[in-house]
Each structure stands twice: as structure tokens, then as C-alpha cells.
Amino acid sequence: MRVETHSPSFTNPNPAEACSGDPTEMGSRLSGVSRAPLPHAAAGRDGEAAAAGKIGAFLRKAVAAQSYGLMFANGKLFEATGDALEKREQYGFSALKRLDGLSRRNLDAVAARLGALDSAEQALKQHIMAGAWHFRHQSNAALDDGEKATIASNHLLSRQARSSGGNTFADDKALLSNHDFVFFGVEFSGRDKNDKPLNHKHSTMDFGANAYVVSDALPACRNGYLTLTDHFFNRVPGGREAEHQDFVGRFAQMGRESGRWIHEGKYRQNAPLFCYRDMKAAVALHLIEFMRNSQDEAFKAYVFDQATQSGPALDRVLNSVFQAEFHIPRLMATTDYAKHPLRPMLLKEAVDSVNLPALSDLVSNRGDAVTAMWHAINKGKDEVVAYLLGNWQFEAKDFSHAPAGFYHELNYALSESGASVYILDQFLSRGWAAVNAPFEHVNRGDTMLDNAVKYGNREMVAALIKHGADRNLLSKWHKSDLDALLA
């Protein structure tokens, strides 16, 4: 699951051109669009404010075009389905037109399968389309300052050499290349954003202790896209996998039926995409299709009789039949949000997400600080180590044995694949690790220099040699590798 910049309000909430526009090149100037909320425009404002709002809307579309261009031009799935764009340095509004075309095609496909709707189905569709939705981003990271929430895409964080942890992996990038979007779960209840979310998981995953909630009317959402499932896995968790077992348990047949792939075409990972204009109609029609195919008469009666009368009841239905995921391009920076603690944060989570305010609350003694330091070593979190070094006093004996739950001794952890050279240097400089001490467990007898050579880490090799690493202690098969690495 799973960056927000915001645009002006529109008189027509679903303009025909919401997903498209004239091809326009913005060039490298777009790289400067980052974390400032863009101005809103509303009826009754003076001409200057309205003009600023139009500029903000244009910039949001221009940035969104880059996110969609990156996805459609680089995702292997879109190449396989014939929907890929040509790779370019910068993308015009044709990238948004591609989304618009896919969305319309996917909506037409489900509408064609259904044919004419009866009166009850029509009423259900209208009820869903008239509903107010909210989008929920869960995270352990510190994404707000109490006044403004700023959530960046994986792609933007990488470009800025920043990371607070994430859930985007190489397979996601290769198949979909959708890592320039911010991911949200969907709250369908229509309750206010200040009300605690009804859902705390997405596709069985708990993505964090805090939820940042925004309205679907937020201008930045107008350039987003919706999938009915997790976009990558594209499967609804049904039955015992579902989050709300109390609800699914009432409709056992529905629970069994809901665990499924939702796709168009022959590729089951080809999750149908829907732009902002089409997303509510898509959810309504796919729900009707599910109900027509369902054998659970009690569930169908519940939907028509109760879910149309209660927002929370409708949310239970839609978050059981689907696991909808909304995606906002690149960045969301807004003051119009609500933050909800869903559960206590774990120390490991605060370290992994580099949430220093939470870490400060969770570390109350040196024992906590030592445990946090081990987590930071394992994850290569330089900023956390710097924070701990600046706020706590440590001794070498604090790290002589790994705490419960950690699998490697200190020297191995400091030099394994992906380890931080900054953290290694800090420990060696303070005498908390012996540069030539042999490993006692994994690869017994090897030293940190063996690990650095094995993983081809020239920077780490240089740091170890600076601190007196003895190349004569290298395993025989690593000596020639060291020469090649330093050549």
C-alpha cells in the first residue's frame, strides 16, 4: 500500500477531462515541484487567487503526467497488455490520456457484462456514487508536523536520497513501475475524516501504527487512480484472511467467494485501473457483478436492505468484497487531513521508519537505547544512530552480546551486506568493535574485512583499512578479491 500536492476545487466534481488534457511538456522544471501545498481556487475569490488556482491545477496535472509516464513506459505488465508508452525523459499529458482510455475501457467492460440494471441495482449504484469517501495512508513514519502532512512517493524519496522505510520492492517496480505514487486504503463509510478509520489493514497487511486520512474531495485526488485490490498482488483476501471476521463470519458463502483475483484480460495481475472520474461507478458496477454471481442470498439481502441505509455497513461490504487502493501522484502536502493513532508503535517500527519523535517517547532508559541501536545497525539507519549517539551514553560492553531476537554478533552485523559504513566507522572510532576480531558464529574465523570484500563494498574496505584491518587475516579465497576490488 502504502505524497500529496493539492489543486483547486472544481464546480463540476467529475469533469470529463479529469483524467486527460492537451499534451504539454514541462521539461526539467518539474523537478522543482516538491513539498509546498499548491493554492486552491474557489467561487467568489478575486481574479488573482483564481489565476493562482488554475496554475496550481496545471502544475498538479503536469507532475501527475510524469508519474503516469514512468508507470506506463516502464511497467512490464503494460508492455505485455499493449498499453505501454514510449520511454521519454519527460512526459506530456498523453500519459493522463492513457489512464483515461484504460479507465473507460475497464468501466465499459464491466458495464457490458452486466447489461441493464434493475431498479434495486440502479439505486445501489447511485447510492455508492453519491457517497463521500476518505483515503487512509498508514505508516510508522513521522509524516506531519501537527499542521501539515507531507507524504512522498518511493520514487521521490529515492531522488532526494531520503527514506523512512517503505513497502515498495523490486518486483513492484519491474511489473508496474508505480513507485511514483502514494498509496491509500479507502474508507467508504462517509464519516468525517476526524472519525477514527473503520479499517486498520490492507490486503491482510498492517502498514503502520498511524493513519493519515484525507477526503476524496481533496484537489490532489483528482489526478489519482483506483484499483479494486492491492495493485501488485491484485487479490482480495477472503474468508479467514479478511480483516473483519465478525462481519465475514455472518456470510460464510460470501467470505469464500470474495477471495479472488479481479482482472481484465488474460493476465490475472492486470488489475483494472480507474481514474477519479470513473472510480465510484467502477466500485458500484463491480459490486453488482459480484452480487449477481454470489450464491449468498443473505448477503445480497443485507446489501440492498441495510448497507444502503448505513455508512459503516456499506464500508464493511465494500472492504470485504474489495480491498480498494487509491494512488496519488508523487506527493501529498496538505493541511486538510486528520491523523489517527491506531495502535501503539513498536520500538523496531520507530527505528525502521526513522521516526525520531516516536523513538524519543519509546526509549526511556539505556537498555531501550541499546536495543534501538541494534535495530539501527541491522537496518542501516544512520540518522537513528546519530540521534542515539547524541542523546545516550554507551560503552563497549553494551554491545558485547546481541539482545534476544538478533541473530548476528556485532562485528558480523556491522559488516554484512547492506550495512552502513557510517555506523561501522562510529563503532570502530569509539572502540566498541575490534576491527580484526574473528567471527564466532556465522562464517567462524572470518573478519569484517572478509565480509566487505565478499560483498564488494569498496567504501567499507577503505574504512576498515583506515582503522587497521589486517589483510593477512583474510580467508585465502578473499585475498585476490581484495586486490581486484582495490585495483
Curated annotation (Swiss-Prot):
Outcome (variant: residue 187 to A): In EH/AA mutant; abolished arginine ADP-riboxanation of host CASP4/CASP11
Record EC number: 4.3.99.-
Entry keyword Protease: no
Top enzyme category: lyase
Cellular component, GO, one term: extracellular region
Compartments in which it is found: Secreted; Host cytoplasm
Compositional bias (Polar residues): 1-14
Endpoints of the signal sequence: none
Keywords from the named record: ANK repeat, Host cytoplasm, Lyase, NAD, Repeat, Secreted, Toxin, Virulence
Predominant place of localization: secreted
GO molecular function, one term: ADP-riboxanase activity
Record's catalysed reaction(s): L-arginyl-[protein] + NAD(+) = ADP-riboxanated L-argininyl-[protein] + nicotinamide + NH4(+) + H(+)
Lyase listed as a keyword: yes
Domain of life from the UniProt record: Bacteria
Active site: 325
Alphabetized Pfam families for the sequence: Ank_3, Shigella_OspC
Annotated site, Important for catalytic activity, chain positions: 137, 183, 207, 230
PROSITE patterns in the cross-refs: ANK_REP_REGION, ANK_REPEAT
ANK repeats: 368-398, 444-473
Region annotated Disordered, chain positions: 1-41
Chain residues that bind NAD(+): 137-139, 164, 167-168
InterPro entries in alphabetical order: Ankyrin_rpt (IPR002110), Ankyrin_rpt-contain_sf (IPR036770), OspC1-4 (IPR010366)
The protein's role, per its UniProt record: ADP-riboxanase effector that inhibits host cell pyroptosis. Acts by mediating arginine ADP-riboxanation of host CASP4/CASP11, blocking CASP4/CASP11 autoprocessing. This prevents CASP4 activation and ability to recognize and cleave GSDMD, thereby inhibiting LPS-induced pyroptosis. ADP-riboxanation takes place in two steps: OspC3 first catalyzes ADP-ribosylation of target Arg, and then initiates a deamination to remove one N-omega group.
Sequence similarity: Belongs to the OspC family.
Name of the featured protein: Arginine ADP-riboxanase OspC3
Organism: Chromobacterium sp. (strain ATCC 53434 / SC 14030)
